Amino acid sequence: MPMKMGWRWYGEGNDPITLSDIKQIPGVTSIVWALHNKMPGEIWEVDEIQKVADQIHAYGFDMDVVESVNVHDDIKIGLPTRDKYIENYKQCIRNLSKFGVKVICYNFMPIFDWTRTDLFHPVGDGSTALFYQKDMIQDDYKAMAEYIMSFTEKYNMTFPGWEPERMAKLDELFKAYAPVTKEKLWENLKYFLEALMPTCRECDIKMAIHMDDPPWDIFGLPRLLVDAESIDRFLSMVDDENNCLTLCSGSLNANPNNNVAEIVRKHCDRIAFAHIRNIHHFPNGDFSEAAHRDCCGETGIIEILRAYHDCGFEGYIRPDHGRQLWEEGPGNCRPGYGKYDRALGIQYMLGVWDLLDRLDEEKKKG
């Protein structure tokens, strides 16, 4: 069975792209979804899941991958209340298993999710893309939060990990995380996963951690999943087939020293979900997200896809952040999640995959 192509969808009324639009993209079989109205720590109830399931199944898609069931801060910090939220997370897993969910993507980044300094940065050809200016990410987390919040308020659009409810409590959160060292965060992640694994085995669901984005500490907050060494540590720390990776090529390659294809070859059996994203690097450490075509960035998309193909990857894959094209912009497009560039990216990925299939067939014929 080949890899299964997915598309991240933010839901009716929350995403300008419809399921009807997605149905017209060749090769997409899986909708990557979530209950985006739920706060970390809340239980996803069966009736809430059923509503989304009915929408997705009406168009013939599966809903095997959830991105994300976010982790409550008390779990990451290691507070005594974490056990209550872990029990809620277990119930989410049980409820999701009733609908055939196979993979839960999540992250363990303190306070912030993925971080960029410009959500619609001109890239020179008329399109825009997510951009990271390294010298803007210093100690002033408030300026960054205000930028994101000004966008969400103006366009009535929220981002996972940057919810207004969380941003209103930033000072409290930074105080709560102050004692949490990198080693303590590792300990808290291990505690969380060891508590979940029996439920994951019972429900046949894989927990697939997303790489930290970008892969270095920001605002004094530790990041864990940043390179090959940390991935080795993570997988050996809880050595269970249900403890897996969401391997994001763009998150890792924001650091050009990371060889994503090598990581794929080493850990393919523990990659449940793959994100394919291309990055263009600047000499000063800034980076811009780029089109998926290999030559448009320095991530090595062809070699990454070849690594997955050589390993016989049968998991789920999706195009990650794309550019905004053809009149897409603030107000009608989620940053990084436009319709056109991701659709183009899928066709590029499938074209490379089909060629690799054909080369294998010809090799077998001799």
Show which residues each predicted segment covers.
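An N-terminal, globular interaction/scaffold subdomain
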Residues: E45-S68, Y85
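Catalytic domains of carbohydrate-active enzymes, especially glycoside hydrolases
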Residues: G13-H36, Q55-Y59, N95-I104
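Conserved beta-strand edge residues that scaffold enzyme active sites
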Residues: H36-N37, N70, P110-I111, P214, ...
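Acidic/aromatic-lined carbohydrate-recognition and catalytic surfaces
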Residues: V65-F99, V103-V123, S127, K134-A145
